[in-house]
């Protein structure tokens, strides 16, 4: 709201932290500077950045936002608990395998499974069939959502899975209260940029795998997601200096060490 008020008053700061959901809105209102000129001149070095990453912040072939890093959905797990249960996790489980392995882990250790009942898992399910969740919803198709909520119901009813009441109490959206932190669950779901924070807070060795897929998947649902963007305000009187900062933020090992990769992998 504060940024919107600043935009309306023509008082945007030189550099704006931008998100996918607002990029087109700000670009269409003429409030974002064209970054392509700084990329072409070499002020912002993109030689080691994939074209697809540049494209993620571009509209109609012009770059208006520079990705600060890339993330991927992940499942993180407690290595010691998994080893105690005598199970091995592949690089990517199916949801059915997650359920079965969760039962084994609960029987052997008493530690419960967490199933992501939110929109991220629903998006993954849609992607397993080569679709996208919001395209399905716009078309009135319910395939992904029906499959997802059937899975949510299955896990909610399982003794081996954390109950909805306890999950709400733990609040997995906050690192410090995630149920894996105190050993209530053996697994958790997040994005890869959160791994260091989760592992440090847990204070023990955690493994990482891809988000689960479905047993009938026709395509790999995993994807890279820009963590956040930086844009330069069109009203900025210091565009080149701002572009130099974006270059440092994106390419500097020093900067990434300071942030501990919190914004994603450069």
Positions of PLM-derived features:
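A ligand-binding cleft/hinge motif common to bilobed small-molecule-binding domains
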Residues: 23-27, 192-205
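Alpha-to-beta junction loops
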Residues: 7-18, 31-33, 111, 181-190
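Conserved N-terminal structural module of periplasmic/extracytoplasmic solute-binding proteins
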Residues: 1-29, 40-47, 61, 170, ...
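Glycine-centered hinge/linker elements that transmit conformational signals in sensory
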Residues: 102-103, 138-170, 211
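Hinge/lid segment of periplasmic solute-binding proteins
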Residues: 20-72, 83, 96-99, 207-212
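Short helix-initiation/N-cap motifs at beta->coil->alpha
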Residues: 1-2, 21, 93-99, 166-181
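Short, solvent-exposed loop/beta-turn-alpha elements that line the ligand-binding surface or hinge
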Residues: 36-49, 91, 131-153, 200-201, ...
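Extracytoplasmic/periplasmic substrate-recognition and gating elements
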Residues: 160, 199-265
């Amino acid at each position: 709201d504060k940024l919107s008020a600043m935009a309306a008053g023509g008082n945007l700061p030189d550099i704006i932290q931008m998100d996918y959901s607002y990029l087109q809105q700000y670009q269409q209102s003429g409030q974002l500077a064209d970054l392509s000129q700084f990329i072409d001149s070499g002020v912002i070095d993109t030689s080691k950045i994939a074209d697809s990453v540049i494209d993620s912040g571009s509209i109609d072939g012009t770059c208006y936002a520079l990705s600060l890093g890339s993330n991927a959905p992940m499942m993180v797990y407690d290595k010691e608990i998994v080893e105690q249960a005598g199970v091995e996790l592949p690089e990517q489980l199916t949801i059915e395998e997650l359920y079965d392995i969760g039962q084994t882990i609960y029987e052997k250790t008493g530690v419960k499974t967490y199933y992501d009942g939110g929109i991220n898992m629903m998006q993954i399910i849609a992607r397993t069939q080569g679709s996208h969740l919001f395209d399905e919803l716009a078309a009135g198709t319910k395939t992904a959502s029906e499959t997802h909520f059937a899975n949510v119901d299955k896990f909610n009813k399982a003794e081996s899975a954390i109950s909805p009441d306890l999950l709400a109490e733990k609040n997995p959206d906050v690192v410090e209260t995630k149920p894996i932190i105190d050993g209530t669950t053996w697994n958790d779901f997040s994005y890869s940029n959160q791994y260091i924070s989760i592992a440090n807070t847990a204070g023990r060795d955690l493994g990482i795998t891809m988000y689960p897929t479905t047993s009938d998947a026709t395509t790999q649902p995993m994807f890279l997601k820009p963590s956040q963007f930086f844009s330069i305000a069109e009203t900025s009187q210091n565009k080149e200096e701002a572009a130099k900062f974006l270059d440092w933020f994106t390419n500097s090992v020093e900067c990434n060490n300071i942030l501990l990769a919190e914004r994603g992998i450069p």
